[in-house]
From Swiss-Prot:
Organism name: Olea europaea (Common olive)
Principal cellular location given in the protein's record: cytoplasm
InterPro entries on file: NAD(P)-bd_dom_sf, NmrA-like, NmrA-type/Isoflavone_red_sf, PCBER-like
Misc. comment: The catalytic tetrad is probably composed of Lys-133, Tyr-158, Ser-159 and Asn-153.
A Pfam family: NmrA
Cellular component GO terms held in the UniProt record: cytoplasm
Protein name per its UniProtKB record: Isoflavone reductase-like protein
MF terms in GO: oxidoreductase activity
CDD domains referenced in this protein's UniProt entry, alphabetically: PCBER_SDR_a
Active site residues according to the UniProt entry: K133 (proton acceptor)
Keyword annotations: Allergen, Cytoplasm, NADP, Oxidoreductase
Family: Belongs to the NmrA-type oxidoreductase family. Isoflavone reductase subfamily.
Cellular location(s): Cytoplasm
Positions of NADP(+) binding: G11, G12, T13, G14, Y15, I16, G17, R36, K45, R137
Length: 308
């Protein structure tokens, strides 16, 4: 185990961060998570930290905004994975600066994990958020830091339990709202699989300075196909309400935060088809299920079974 790549996760108690920490610990990489004192003592996040410790994760006390603590943590590892949330995306320049100073990092994974921000046509407010991710990518490239950008598309846990329906907590049983014409294809990945694929990429020369797209063939569905699959599972035909693009754009403008950002992401994926309207070229990207055929990923069909 001594020669296994040491991995530091920054933002490990966040939504996708937890899955990446778990995948790293499970794969027997020496795993480190950076946490603030306030996170460790927090009643909710403290439990997550304790869970990490129980899995053999080393907790390093530090802060994104404390340069010395960042450098000190980074010097102990080989690979840095950032899973910081929306509000800290721009502050990843601090991680970049610390990586440059530490000088020992073999790979940096910034907090990406969604749509490929360099190949999308999102409207505000998602546009600004994607632009920040894009700026971080350019900063990493400019500094010559070895990287992998993970494009994980939709998190299944965010989208499939409601079949991408707004402001509900269960999948539809009567009627379903479909954005656009319902034909643009999107991609849905179970969070544990995102963690597994990300950690597999850590030591892989094929993913160095590339975008790792998580697009397993059985998880690519248009809205219409997703609805048809659900109808088959529940043995019932749903009433379909199609929302034309102009109306989707109007709803985005009129909705409060954070509903508007979710709607803008859905518009990008389901109206513009931004998750699938380009070909992955070897010059910039690789696809996870092709690289790692041994990973038995959860399919959309299997995932939906729990809600029937």
């Amino acid at each position: 185990m001594a020669d296994k790549t040491k991995i530091l996760i920054i933002g490990g108690t966040g939504y996708i961060g937890k899955f990446i920490v778990e995948a790293s610990a499970k794969s027997e990489h020496p795993t480190f998570a950076l946490a603030r004192e306030s996170t460790i003592s927090d009643p909710v996040k403290g439990k997550i930290i304790q869970g990490f410790k129980n899995s053999g994760v080393t907790i390093l006390t530090g802060d994104l905004y404390d340069h010395e603590s960042l450098v000190k943590a980074i010097k102990q590892v080989d690979v840095v994975i950032s899973t910081v949330g929306q509000l800290q995306l721009a502050d990843q320049v601090k991680i970049i600066a610390a990586i440059k100073e530490a000088g020992n990092v073999k790979r940096f994974f910034p907090s990406d994990f969604g749509t490929d921000v360099d190949r999308c046509h999102a409207v505000e407010p998602a546009k600004s958020s994607f632009e920040i991710k894009s700026q971080i990518r350019r900063a990493i490239e400019a500094e010559g830091i070895p990287y992998t950008f993970v494009s994980a598309n939709y998190f299944a846990g965010y989208s499939l339990p409601t079949l991408v329906q707004p402001e509900v907590t269960a999948p539809p049983r009567d009627k379903v709202i479909i954005l656009g014409d319902g034909n643009a294809k999107a991609v849905f990945n179970e969070e544990n699989d995102i963690g597994t694929y990300t950690i597999k990429a850590v030591d892989d020369a094929r993913t160095l300075n590339k975008i790792l797209y998580i697009k397993p063939p059985k998880n690519i569905y248009s809205f219409n196909e997703l609805v048809a699959l659900w109808e088959k599972k529940i043995g019932k035909t749903l009433e379909k309400i199609y929302v034309p693009e102009e109306q989707v754009l109007k709803q985005i403008q009129e909705s409060p935060f954070p509903i508007n950002i979710v709607m803008a992401i859905n518009h990008s994926a389901f109206v513009k088809g931004d998750l699938t309207n380009f070909k992955i070229e070897p010059s910039f990207g690789v696809e996870a299920s092709e690289l790692y055929p041994d990973v038995k990923y959860t399919t959309v069909e299997e995932y939906l079974d729990q809600f029937v």
